[in-house]
Amino acid sequence: MLRLARPLCVQTVKASKLSRLWSRPAALMSTLLIHHPQYAWLQDLGLREDNEGVFNGSWGGRGEVITTYCPANNEPIARVRQASMKDYEETIGKAKKAWNIWADIPAPKRGEIVRKIGDALREKIQLLGRLVSLEMGKILVEGIGEVQEYVDVCDYAAGLSRMIGGPTLPSERPGHALMEQWNPLGLVGIITAFNFPVAVFGWNNAIALITGNVCLWKGAPTTSLVSIAVTKIIAKVLEDNLLPGAICSLTCGGADMGTAMARDERVNLLSFTGSTQVGKQVALMVQERFGKSLLELGGNNAIIAFEDADLSLVLPSALFAAVGTAGQRCTTVRRLFLHESIHDEVVDRLKNAYSQIRVGNPWDPNILYGPLHTKQAVSMFVQAVEEAKKEGGTVVYGGKVMDHPGNYVEPTIVTGLVHDAPIVHKETFAPILYVFKFKNEEEVFEWNNEVKQGLSSSIFTKDLGRIFRWLGPKGSDCGIVNVNIPTSGAEIGGAFGGEKHTGGGRESGSDAWKQYMRRSTCTINYSTALPLAQGIKFQ
């Protein structure tokens, strides 16, 4: 699913060199994009050339300094001073104190605060969307849409704040009531990845807040400016409502900060979005202390198109799901299974559609396809294409690094591989689509389920019986099981997450709120009698 940024993606400078770095001559400082007139709007988000990456009611940071880069041209944007372990300890302490205030506020009033956060985000949606596009690399419409998703989740959470609760159940004993009580966990740690630096935090943050928790956020180092800008907006809302800023804290940092959160018993729930490999390490650290974790990990998603599929739906769905966000979505389609009777036609039409994709600067509203996030991602793309060729695949479209400033690669289609080729079962976070022929429903359902991940899946068919078999116990084993729509994109009203090596976590809608709370079963005796088991009586 979502990958954590690696250390290679950022320039790290020891804290001892901090003053020297931040007192560079003006000529050198002007190389940062934030100093260029066309990026002056960054200052409207409260950003500057040197930014503090810790917030716990006040801004600070005593850790290393990193520089974040624009994936479209690999130019430096600005610098961020990350959290030290001392900053982390101070932030945890302040967050815990803030919880004592936040937990006493009635849930509907907490919902009102979350609604105000959504309103504040809405006012900055264009600027934040541009920042997401600049620092992450996704096209502008996707960057704005991601902020809109956070706004929508705030609206959803505000309504949900009046509905959370447990049932009253029939008691077996006369004069007794049986009920469920739901209470907040306390401190929710949120570790997000680079590819959705706003929305995934929003899913967790909005629901965690209305359920009575405080939050500590560690975003990906390569999208630190997004984390800071979003936190500044939230902090203003909290300040205006006379609430402690530590209700929504931030500690920018790398793997050391994530490890500290995973091992810290004071973090009552850790929501982690990233690779399966790192997620497994996180899960083991949290489980070792009998903590709670919410994992959103790898996805190796498939679309299946049967002989009766409406190709006017299949083609745009496959295109959108394969190349959207340059193949860096957790729900990106990576495997396309086509019935043998339509395989050749669909591949030819897909190749034609790929040739019309407009590539360029992601903040240009006319562009549909932007860069990969880092140079490392480009290297992984090249390696995957070569592995696919060695395993018998044929690149029928793309497959090369583009001669373009930044981290651009060609959207790629590969045919001729067997369904269980090693490269097919390996998730590569890049726009590579593996296409296969199949003969019948039974075999293709098995192929869909044979990968270790289980996030998203979709079939295209008009056969009602097949649709319900797909949705049933012998159909898709994924957490998202679609019909006649792409694998990518998810409505906030449904629970988002996957099975198997995807981690089993659920975020956003439906009853995902339960993961942020603890349940108590309560028996209340409102009579004067005390019936005991097995008919025991006290004389």
UniProtKB/Swiss-Prot annotation:
Organism lineage string: Eukaryota, Metazoa, Chordata, Craniata, Vertebrata
Positions annotated to bind NAD(+): 192-194, 218, 258-259, 274-279, 296-297, 427
This protein's name: Alpha-aminoadipic semialdehyde dehydrogenase
Keywords noted in UniProt: Acetylation, Cytoplasm, Mitochondrion, NAD, Nucleus, Oxidoreductase, Transit peptide
Modification N6-succinyllysine, positions: K86, K94, K97, K537
Record site feature (Transition state stabilizer), residues: N195
InterPro entries: Ald_DH/histidinol_DH, Ald_DH_C, Ald_DH_CS_GLU, Ald_DH_N, Aldehyde_DH_dom, ALDH7A1-like
Example GO biological process: glycine betaine biosynthetic process from choline
